[in-house]
Amino acid sequence: MTQLTNNFTLEELTHTDHREYENVPNETEKANLMRLAEFLELVKQLLGNAPIMVNSAFRSKQVNDAVGSKDTSQHRVGCAADIRVPGMTPDQVTKAIIASDLQFDQVIREFDRWTHVSIPNNPYDKPRKMALIIDKQGTRKYS
């Protein structure tokens, strides 16, 4: 196992149920996954060291296409993770991240099932701090 941080491994951030497709990041994507793992450690601390379950992080083009996501998805470059936190709702996780001083690029409550968190694709870019909701009504600003 390749440990990226104390609590997150490369295998965890590249896991996919679509095993028929290769899901191996290149060196740039691995560097992004390291930054993402460091960010997830901060989220974990923010949430009182609660366990974070990663549903999806890095996605190769084939995996991304298989799940029906856009080519511009930050998952494609290793800068996004869809997470669940046992004992917390996605709304609670989203609110906690928004209220914090964490430098997130996006936080999205998706279908009340998970929280999408991302960091800037370029480590030198300023985080956009976009807070959104995606559900059957569409995409809108978090309020």
Language model features with spans:
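Extracytoplasmic cell-surface/polysaccharide-interacting catalytic and binding patches
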Residues: 1-48, 137-143
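Acidic, His- and aromatic-enriched active-site or binding-groove loops in soluble protein domains
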Residues: 71-92
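Short, polar loop/linker segments at the starts of domains and inter-domain junctions
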Residues: 23-27, 69, 127-130
